[in-house]
Amino acid sequence: MQTILTYRLRGFALLICALVMLSSRSVAQEGQAGYAYRDGEHFVDIEGVSILGNRPIKEIGIQQTPIDSVALKENIALSMADVLTFRSSVFVKSYGRATLSTVAFRGTSPSHTQVKWNGMKLNSPMLGMTDFSLIPAYFIDKATLLHGTSSVNDTGGGLGGSVRLATAPVESRGFTLQYIQGIGSFRSFDEFLRLGWGNDHWQLSTRAVVSTSPNDFKYTNRDKKVNIYDDEMNIIDQYYPVERNRSGSYRDFHILQEAYYDTKAGDRFGINAWYLNSNRELAMLTVDHGDDVEFDNRQREQTLRAVASWEHLRSSWKMGARAGYIHTSMAYDYKRDLGNGVMADMTRSRNKINTIYGEVDGEYYISSKWLFTANLSMHQHFVESRDKNIIIQSGDKGIVGYRQARVELSGAVSAKWRPNDRFGLSVVLREELFGDDFTPIIPALFVDGVISKRGNIVAKASISRNYRYPTLNDLYFLPGGNPNLKSESGWTYDAGVSFAVGSEGKYRLNGSLTWFDSHISDWIIWLPTTKGFFSPRNIKDVHAYGIELNASLDVALAKEWRLSLDGNFSWTPSINEGEKLSPADQSVGKQLPYVPELTSTVNGRLSWRKWSFEYKWCYYSERYTMSSNDYMLTGKLPEYFMSNISLERRFAPRWADLVAKFTINNLFDEEYLSVLSRPMPGINFQLQLSITPKW
């Protein structure tokens, strides 16, 4: 083991050397014919030819979904979970309004979705997933979804895909201010404030969001029936009661401080610090018959995320380094009145997570035909989990939990080749370390080619192998953790075609169709044991396959009239192909629980002068709640359609830019469930006012 570990560490050392060699060789060649190096909106002008065009060499064969900046700033009340629900083909599983919301690609689980913010992972080292309801859309300036194999370009472990989130400097001159007030149904209030200042070198920004609501919406409880009696106490009829969402209030506060310094000579420095304070009640289930005053079910979280970055850009090469820190303190309390008026602790959970992050990367263009990249990142986690439960042990209370530290290293090198403007090939090799355990090499191959320049028809294909290491809870949670778990592994294949046509100033139409096929072995699932608790096991082989389709249209209809449309559709069978655990096991050959086979979204925006009207629609097919796909009453959740509309008016007096927006959510008052027994709101309204003074 010592020899293998030494060998692998030498491999990472060689990767670091590759980064240094990329930069040193580039310095030696600087002064030759230059190439314009662009990095998003930031670039250095060097005399020469442009190596990036309509098909950037960095994106050879990649299947991705960029989220439009307009969608990110559409509504102050939206989280990234709300944005992705209507703007992508992924499945957003929500436990209710302002509660846990997770994202899953292509029939996989939320822990198979890797999430990065300014390069740093947001996935919980305890659970492996990310709560998108705690990410305000107004705090994100750039968002991109990388599907399947494409996620290997960013990180390992994304068996379904990855989500890349980033902030960006506002590029302002002088002092700027923006304030937004949102008022909605259920006494919901959302406020946003952004202060900024900038000059030729500095960009400073402060953003703050506060969201509060008792969240006591009404709904028809289909899990209960109330009897109607006659005078002789005979049941003559029944009805479903209308109830309020009980114990579902929330208060979320976020503040984001950013500072950027640009030397204008190829170096840029940045600091991003994001603090959140969340206090949320966990609403009672539709099957709860008790009085809400008899319970206190609450989760509190304080998290600080900070990243410092440096970028060094030259004509044909780039280097960067980032360092970061995450501190999370989470508290969960479940209290109950035992009948004497005193609230007693049933569960008292305290979790603390500290993560140290570091990353270096480099890119080097030999010419307009070759790009080489190298990347090495490190996340060092320190986790302390403590749960105080009622234990059957002479009536005493016992404390169980764990304290663990784990380092996670991820290194990758890639070579991208585009010999002409019709063909491209990319190879990525990645390896990761979790504690003392290395994953096998994670390879990925990407290829794309222009089928026809008329219509910009491009074919893409890719293949990769990937691994996901068990989370700390999977390994060490008490009771139930299983230190003998194996890593999940899988092969993923993608193939698709895209097109883009248009006429400048008149219309633009583009779309893509992708087929994917994924085989995942040793799928980890928590199962009940004979000892009365759950424990994770490697039991499933899962075959997830299907198609993804998206299209968008932007057209100028007439003078001052513009129509924008976009839509997504996915068909994602995700089948358990493992062996039966017992003769009674009915899960083999069935769709995985809480994975819709069909999802679809449509967005339309019609603009005229200073008016805008928007319609949003999404659809999820039925989802099974049990691995046996049982059709019993609670065995599946029905399909549902969701429609939202909004009307916006902009005003431009001399002293400020003003925007008024009225939104109707759940336009047709749809009754639906995302998770069994978790109530969801019906039709609701919001008014939003925005002011940006002109200094």
Where are these regions (language model features)?
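Conserved C-terminal beta-signal and adjacent last beta-strands/turns
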Residues: 28, 207, 260-265, 457-461, ...
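Short, acidic, small-residue-rich periplasmic hinge/interaction motif at the N-terminus
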Residues: 30-73, 110
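N-terminal periplasmic accessory domains that precede
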Residues: 48, 80-83, 101-104, 116, ...
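Extracytoplasmic beta-strand/coil segments of soluble accessory domains associated
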Residues: 81-124
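Periplasmic-side early beta-strands and strand-to-turn transitions of outer-membrane beta-barrels
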Residues: 197-297
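Membrane-embedded beta-barrel scaffold of Gram-negative outer-membrane proteins
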Residues: 314-334, 452, 458-460, 487-545, ...
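Gram-negative outer-membrane beta-barrel transporters
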Residues: 418-424, 515-519, 538-626
